[in-house]
Amino acid sequence: MGLSIFLLLCVLGLSQAATPKIFNGTECGRNSQPWQVGLFEGTSLRCGGVLIDHRWVLTAAHCSGSRYWVRLGEHSLSQLDWTEQIRHSGFSVTHPGYLGASTSHEHDLRLLRLRLPVRVTSSVQPLPLPNDCATAGTECHVSGWGITNHPRNPFPDLLQCLNLSIVSHATCHGVYPGRITSNMVCAGGVPGQDACQGDSGGPLVCGGVLQGLVSWGSVGPCGQDGIPGVYTYICKYVDWIRMIMRNN
């Protein structure tokens, strides 16, 4: 009953915080991203996330709220899809190497353990972790409810998707000299297409596996020509992720 009441409150009133969203994407196919998570504080969307196990969600470390309402199986944020599941995050584990966005964006990932496991359905499913690292030129996509390029309605109601490709480490280092490490991967750089404010922690999916989490990018407008977004390179953290889940 408590979750049902909370869901009704969510669909009756929704606000979105100015934290990284999909810029110039298109509506995702319904149920095409069953691992997509929205992290809410009350009715305010704070970050994206990705379901990687029936009880674990992965998001960005800079999404620093202590407790979240975790919404899964969502497509529209303002209308009932009848596929939603709501969970409350229990405890979380931030990567011990993360020093904060003001110091370095490295190790920008955080695991959230759900108080109750999800029910796996066609609309709610975990996304596999990678066995290998995606290389330059790999075609991927990113999803979220972040800022769009529509001036009258910058915060989308419907889940947005965007296709983009992995950029070489050398190219990305040239754009962000001295700031890119081997634990980061860059994608995009096509004019007008990017993750943007509000998509933080959301998944970069390549070949049906999780390769990145939306982390950071240019301080200027989203979707600048030749300016890729920067993602936490999940292939570098698989052992740590599995250790945390196994021990908790």
Curated annotation (Swiss-Prot):
It is an enzyme of class 3 (hydrolase). It is found in: Secreted. Glycans are attached at N24, N163. GO terms for molecular function: peptidase activity; serine-type endopeptidase activity; serine-type peptidase activity. GO terms for cellular component: extracellular region; extracellular space; secretory granule. The keyword Lipid biosynthesis does not apply. Its EC number is 3.4.21.-. CDD domains: Tryp_SPc. Residues 22-246 form the Peptidase S1 domain. Keywords: Disulfide bond, Glycoprotein, Hydrolase, Protease, Secreted, Serine protease, Signal. One of its GO terms (biological process) is protein maturation. Disulfide bonds join C28-C161, C47-C63, C133-C235, C140-C206, C172-C186, C196-C222. Residues 1-17 form the signal peptide. The active site is at H62 (charge relay system), D108 (charge relay system), S200 (charge relay system). The keyword ATP-binding does not apply. Belongs to the peptidase S1 family. Kallikrein subfamily. This is Kallikrein-12. It comes from Homo sapiens.
